[in-house]
Amino acid sequence: GDEKRLKEILAMLKSRLQMSFLSSGHTTAALRSLSYTSPMAKFKDDTDGIGYYEVVKELEENFEEKKSELIANLRQIAQQIFRKDNLIISYTSSADGLAPMEEAFAKIADTLHTEEKEAETPCEIHCVKRNEGFKTSSKVQYVARTGNFIDRGVEYTGALQILKVILSYDYLWQNVRVKGGAYGCMSSFNRIGEGYLVS
């Protein structure tokens, strides 16, 4: 493998994540806060949020010490993904075009992994409640408060979407944006009970 290119990719990924946090601080704050109690949000944070950024940053800043383990893990993942039994081909053409394609597909399939799969283990995601803050170069601060209303015995109904509009464009806008001088505010409630307020 090309170690220099791998380090460049990590640096580029780190930079892109930093930029996305600056441009989407409200959703970043909401996702991170939801990850304290929601396994689904924790997975999303670990694969595309602050949790993911922390892993990428650690790998990029300590590349020399971590590169062997990273390369071994990437190879293991590649063996699990790029397999003959995972290959699905969708092809549209006349019957005449199929024969040359079958030959090309066979060549591709021959390059894929066929060794026995490792036994699958269930993925357990453990949420940890935290009270944390993150510093960026932005002069805008984002604050999020999240929770699960179904866990508190409140069912999801369409009325929550009306509440979202009222909160976001009336109450929160007037009290947080206009009176308080905040940059903006938003709220959301979904069908699995997750709700958040962000300013």
What feature does the model see in each segment?
Residues 88-144, 149:
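An aromatic/glycine/proline-enriched structural segment found at the starts
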Residues 1, 105-109, 163:
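Short amphipathic C-terminal alpha-helix that caps PH/PH-like domains
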Residues 73-75, 127-133, 183-184:
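Glycine-rich, charged/polar anion/phosphate-binding loops
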Residues 66-70, 113, 121-126, 162-166, ...:
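A short linear-motif detector with a strong N-terminal bias
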Residues 44, 49, 71-105:
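Non-catalytic, conformational "gating/processing" segments within enzyme and secreted inhibitor domains
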Residues 1-64, 84-93, 142-162, 168, ...:
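M16 family metallopeptidases and their MPP-like homologs
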Residues 59-71, 75-77:
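Aromatic-residue-lined binding/catalytic grooves and analogous aromatic/hydrophobic interfacial grooves
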